[in-house]
């Protein structure tokens, strides 16, 4: 008997039977071994056959195990296992049956047919189960669908639809699909195309996240509810699983063979099946090797003839990139465009999905949370589509609330840690016997008892609240199940069951839920069971970094005292500080224009007066870190072509994939301070790019993505007019300086650029008093740096006045002061520390001696 006459599945089963005999110390491979191997095989071809024949496979398997146990065992045979004479006779019988049926190969089901004719114990068992040759032959015909076994892989290609597709109508019947709200026009258009005689293949096109797959799920739900035209009633919607189709196709042509078997089975169904191909573009080029066809080309004939009812779904970009390049494939599909829903439509969709998410997370989702999710995601998440981004917010907010319920509340956790800490201290003190330790131990025991009592009370409250929450959850789950049962009864036409549920079980559960909810409504101290708009805002803030949550009292207080905080570091610039503070307050109060940046400012004035320092202080105030500022030195953008560095190189140029310096920074941190330093040094064309940012708060990068600047503060600094200030400094007051500077600025910048800037602020030149205050700030920083190295520093008033005098230069601002501190204080101190003349941990005083600042210890 040649092994290559068997199908590949049958060959694997024979190898498994050999292993089974070897493992059980049997000398011969009997038909029972092979039958067990066939039943245990992964993707067994025998199991579906026995299911059709109404055989209890588990009962059969246990009977076969008993037969194996009765076979004689021979120990120490050294791994020599042979085919028994019964097995040889069985194979010959299989060959005879295969020839009779005109099969080129012997398949697994032929062995079952031969086993029934067997006079041995296996044949006897099948007779007891009521199997006859006629019954098995009919079942084989049903499974094969009239096909002969002309290929070694024939068994793997059988029931291709079950293996390579997912039945959406079946899932809809089981209530596993989410409800589809709205989208009536798109579903109607899809049905309209499916009803055509030829080219009845809609392709649903839209941006990622607008609900393309949901439309097909909606179609499946309408089919099972009989809400479709006569022509589509009773149809099945099958989703093609491309992963299963490609997985394990090792040899050339195997993928095509699988796809062909799917198409053959579809054609046999004669239009009763609608095939849904999600990510349709994956079909173009799938399975393409040198000289072989791809899946897209194999689909074309069936699509054109109208044999295959196919619904595709893909994004706009991928449709253009893959489908439109193949006009022959494109003309076979009819486009159904799906737009992003409006905020109002999204709210309706979320209300429909609300119950599913409540049931999954075991929390309650309030209506304000739904409205907030739709409106906030629409405003602040610009690079994704509704309703997907709004559903994400609801899902994550519900998940965070659930996590708080399941894990210990923060108050309880802190108390537990404190008790552990006190117990460790108690253990350490119990070994000490001096008076102080005993006194401390007594007070510690009192504190520990107090904390443990507090912990016990809180834990009791927590457990009671958890129990209350889980009670409502069980009722909600039962109510959902009752509603699903009612839907099944409606479809089955079981009126008595429907009335029992509608007028008995469901109202009773709703009443129970009301009572449980009222009990739960009593103010909970530890747990929250509701997703409100606050939770949605918190999740959005974590995702994007944009503060949209309601302000706490501390933050309101901080914003009202913003000028005070900024003035601690920025000296003598009242107007500039006020302008910036007002812009931030407008934004946080929600009054700023939603289509423009939070604020855009042009800071002008002489060098060294605090223009850049104000930006750093603002970033520090808003984000507690100066690094949160996106700083771009415009002196690097002097050439015309360097503009591309800001938004990214255009296609075809080197660096296209990398993205722009400015756009990438803002995409990662949508809420930030952008500082364009020394803006007048840049090429004039750079300002053309800034026009869109300042006016509409948006910019398109080199890859065509729109970057949102609406949550940024744009600050530009410039030294324009500083030469005039130097020339006329002694003669002019602040108003005169401002006029001179503005004259130069209006000549240099275009009017459309200046007109778009919210505020143009000219900084004051610094006076002697300002320099003294700045000197105090600078010396304080120096003292902090020295403190870290163990050298405490104290500066006398005279030393402060002297350094302020030395560092004062009305033209150059505060920068000469920095140099003066370096030369007069830092350099001598560094020498003293290295020489060892000043000692660590001993105060160093800076005093004035002969108009010189000296360090004294």
UniProtKB/Swiss-Prot annotation:
This is Chaperone protein ClpB. The Clp repeat (R) domain probably functions as a substrate-discriminating domain, recruiting aggregated proteins to the ClpB hexamer and/or stabilizing bound proteins. The NBD2 domain is responsible for oligomerization, whereas the NBD1 domain stabilizes the hexamer probably in an ATP-dependent manner. The movement of the coiled-coil domain is essential for ClpB ability to rescue proteins from an aggregated state, probably by pulling apart large aggregated proteins, which are bound between the coiled-coils motifs of adjacent ClpB subunits in the functional hexamer. It holds the Pfam family Clp_N. InterPro entries: AAA+_ATPase, ATPase_AAA_core, Chaperonin_ClpB, Clp_ATPase_C, Clp_N_dom_sf, Clp_R_dom, ClpA/B, ClpA/B_CS1. Residues 6-71 are annotated as: Repeat 1. Residues 341-545 are annotated as: Linker. PROSITE patterns: CLP_R, CLPAB_1, CLPAB_2. One of its GO terms (cellular component) is cytoplasm. Residues 3-146 form the Clp R domain. GO terms for biological process: cellular response to heat; protein refolding. It comes from Vibrio vulnificus (strain CMCP6). Belongs to the ClpA/ClpB family. It is found in: Cytoplasm. Residues 766-857 are annotated as: C-terminal. Homohexamer. The oligomerization is ATP-dependent. Gene3D superfamilies: 1.10.8.60, Clp, N-terminal domain (1.10.1780.10), P-loop containing nucleotide triphosphate hydrolases (3.40.50.300). Residues 83-146 are annotated as: Repeat 2. ATP 1 binds at residues 206-213. Keywords: ATP-binding, Chaperone, Coiled coil, Cytoplasm, Nucleotide-binding, Repeat, Stress response. ATP 2 binds at residues 605-612. Residues 391-525 form a coiled coil. Residues 555-765 are annotated as: NBD2.
